[in-house]
Amino acid sequence: MEQVNELKEKGNKALSAGNIDDALQCYSEAIKLDPQNHVLYSNRSAAYAKKGDYQKAYEDGCKTVDLKPDWGKGYSRKAAALEFLNRFEEAKRTYEEGLKHEANNLQLKEGLQNMEARLAERKFMNPFNLPNLYQKLENDPRTRTLLSDPTYRELIEQLQNKPSDLGTKLQDPRVMTTLSVLLGVDLGSMDEEEEAATPPPPPPPKKEAKPEPMEEDLPENKKQALKEKELGNDAYKKKDFDKALKHYDKAKELDPTNMTYITNQAAVHFEKGDYNKCRELCEKAIEVGRENREDYRQIAKAYARIGNSYFKEERYKDAIHFYNKSLAEHRTPDVLKKCQQAEKILKEQERLAYINPDLALEEKNKGNECFQKGDYPQAMKHYTEAIKRNPRDAKLYSNRAACYTKLLEFQLALKDCEECIQLEPTFIKGYTRKAAALEAMKDYTKAMDVYQKALDLDSSCKEAADGYQRCMMAQYNRHDSPEDVKRRAMADPEVQQIMSDPAMRLILEQMQKDPQALSEHLKNPVIAQKIQKLMDVGLIAIR
């Protein structure tokens, strides 16, 4: 359990640092050692979600709930993955199921509220999510003055994020006025018309509904600025960047409160490859946007463009910093994907930059000294550092495998031996150490197979020959109790998988009742292989 906790903590630190693949590896190794630990599946679900692999996040969320049905966090993980997969109805049901077990769980309550809001948005269009929302409000004199009030902007953002709150906000006259502007109808007169039930009001003449404010309602400077912007856009599309810059600059002079004209200038410099100027203009645009309470989506775009400029220069650490700033303002799939791409490249760069065979040799020698003294934990640390410094050296994995075997961490020893053999298939030590780990686990059949592979490479290898003889004698003389056999067998992940297969359990029951059925089942090579595995580990015997 100490090894499991250590791997879990390493995974948590890696996830916090943004090293998602490292976190996944740690959690997966811990799960192999403790497959019934619900917390490990929950943590791995979070890591998969952060990576963008929502299907695997969902599968781990389901496993968490199966292992610990009364734990609210499991339902949160499962529901969050369903949300990312756009399976909103299922996510809602999952939150509801979780609340049956933990009625006061705040995370589940908020998740359910958000899910209900998103489902409501699907059924009814949310006018507060219009792409040109602030432009419409600024164009209409009824709402233009309201935009200078910070509480009004907070109200708008609240209704954008939680449209289900609209029903509770209708008492606010500002909300009714805003709806009138956004929907293009005069909601203020509706109550009066409903009260005059008889006689009913005559049907309104066609096209008498209040028209949406047109460009004519804008001040002259803003109208001219928009025209300059359109001219700039046309020039930009034709890649006439100098002309585009002149028009955007003129638009900015006419309407200095609109950050869009500055970000358009930044886009031109981005295309020209002048990334310093692009970043300078984006920073200026953000400053103008903050001062004039611009929509957070526009702020996010400016930060994303700064991130893109650093990405182009292969300055991935800076790019990640600004992508995260953009995501904090407004989360979009494109920016998230770009950020993850930059993180992956940066991680690989750091890994490659860390490689140094000379330092790896120093760490290996330190590890050898500690191993000779019997200080196996310290030796393992030195070998691990050596592997980071030179991950293509097969002997380092072999040395660390020897440490793991001394520390009775046989599964980890086997993993290192596999890596060693893969890197250098003719290296005898990789095979003998793998066989030694299997022998220590009392898996004599597998151990003999591996010792034989070593002898195939070098028939004079005394270590392999002696090991083969030991395993043969141990297999012949073994008198394990049924409990020992079962406990040892069930520690093997392959056996666990076979025994958890409902079809195999049915076949084994049938073999007990009708031994003649065995010959039929052995005709299927897949089933025959599984039965042979169970025989090898001593779980079943055929007489």
Swiss-Prot record:
Domain (STI1) spans 130-169, 492-531
Ubl conjugation is among the record's keywords: yes
Query: In the record, which positions carry N6-acetyllysine?
Result: K8, K301, K312, K325, K344, K446
Query: What highest taxon heads this organism's lineage?
Result: Eukaryota
**CC annotations in GO:** dynein axonemal particle; nucleus; protein folding chaperone complex; protein-containing complex
Keyword set includes Phosphoprotein: yes
A molecular-function term among this protein's GO annotations: Hsp70 protein binding
Q: List residues modified as Phosphothreonine.
A: T198, T332
Q: What start-end ranges are recorded for coiled-coil regions in this protein? A: none
Biological process, per Gene Ontology:
cellular response to interleukin-7
The subcellular location is:
Cytoplasm; Nucleus; Dynein axonemal particle
**Phosphotyrosine occurs at which residues?**
Y354
Cited function: Acts as a co-chaperone for HSP90AA1. Mediates the association of the molecular chaperones HSPA8/HSC70 and HSP90.
Question: What is the protein's quaternary organization?
Answer: Probably forms a complex composed of chaperones HSP90 and HSP70, co-chaperones STIP1/HOP, CDC37, PPP5C, PTGES3/p23, TSC1 and client protein TSC2. Forms a complex with HSPA8/HSC70, HSPCA/HSP-86 and HSPCB/HSP-84. Interacts with PACRG. Interacts with EEF1AKMT3. Interacts with HSP90/HSP90AA1; the interaction dissociates the PPP5C:HSP90AA1 interaction. Interacts with FLCN, FNIP1 and FNIP2. Interacts with HSPA8/HSC70. Interacts with HSP90AB1; upon SMYD2-dependent HSP90AB1 methylation.
The molecule here is called: Stress-induced-phosphoprotein 1
Report the source organism.
Rattus norvegicus
